[in-house]
Amino acid sequence: MVLFSEDHIQETRRRGRIEVICGSMFSGKTEELIRRMKRAKFARQRVEIFKPAIDTRYSEGDVVSHDSNSISSTPIDSSASILLFTSEIDVVGIDEAQFFDSGLIDVCNQLANNGVRVIIAGLDMDFKGVPFGPMPALCAIADEVSKVHAICVKCGQLASFSHRTVKNDKQVLLGETAQYEPLCRECYQRALQEDREKS
């Protein structure tokens, strides 16, 4: 005789959620996004990854980490475009979220409310130490926030700040290793003071 057991009920309803991976430059944000997306693909989930079209540093069509790990992606100009590609998708990945418009917040909420797992990676602060683009609001609505850290190039402590090493005041300057360095709070404050003295 087989008894009905709730333990054997298989969950078939999709549960949406928002996961944010944030931190400074060179902290492994994109690396972690790629890892989570590849795990989802391995589990035969339908995935789609998006990045801002302006990010062509390593590849026009792929999301690429500073360590050269990559995964195929769709470059887009506007966050609203994400909804055009996600009707049959289980997991959505979004890299460099700080470069998207504020509409990304509603897009992510809409996807999660419709059962999609949304994984977002982005800088939480710009080179001035100011919260960057839609990232603060995305952290607020997220079900899970992972703050990742680089290592301070000056003292070896955990680094939360991205110091720009070239003179340029534009908020958006797509950076590679020569243009930014990760610093801890103390070394970052010292570097800002040195920058002011040079000006």
Swiss-Prot record:
It comes from the Bacteria. InterPro entries: P-loop_NTPase, Thymidine_kinase. ATP binds at G23, S24, M25, F26, S27, G28, K29, T30, D95, E96, A97, Q98. One of its GO terms (cellular component) is cytosol. The keyword Metal-binding applies. Its EC number is 2.7.1.21. NCBIfam families: PRK04296.1-1. HAMAP family: Thymidine_kinase. Belongs to the thymidine kinase family. Homotetramer. This is Thymidine kinase. The lineage of its organism: Bacteria, Pseudomonadati, Bacteroidota, Bacteroidia, Bacteroidales.
